[in-house]
Amino acid sequence: FFIEVKSCSNKHLTCPEIPKVNINGPCACDEGWDEHGGKCYYFSTNKSSWTESRDECRAKGGDLVKIDNWCEQIFLRTRLNGKMENFEDMFWIGLTDAVEEGRWLWLDGSPLNTSLSFWADHEPDNWTHENPDGEHCVRLGEEEGEEPLKTCLTDGSTKH
């Protein structure tokens, strides 16, 4: 798996989102959501832009996922592996450099913990061929021909 930067307007699968969690008792997620580490995740296979994906997450009471630790990253890698039919299937995550080029922030404003990032070899590259402003959104997926258990994060915002 890797992280890749892409144009925010490109169509990709909606990212996992973090919604309702019962803090005072055992975690009980709504039907269709997966629980891990006290958080609930919804995996949508709708292909949409980063903004459309975020809107879908927020309508369900969550947001695009913020990866806080290695355990969460491994959980996401494992769950997403079962959702992807081919290497182009990637999921938007809540990481962007839209506020300041090259400074990667989660949607809550916290900076990317670089010890948790696994950029693809060529990323972030701020590719400007499709959009002169470059790329500002991040997607999580698997590189073509890579081992299924290998993980890396990529900044992505292209359409498919």
Kindly give the residue locations of the regions a language model identified.
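Extracellular, disulfide-bonded carbohydrate-recognition/adhesion ectodomains
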Residues: 1-160
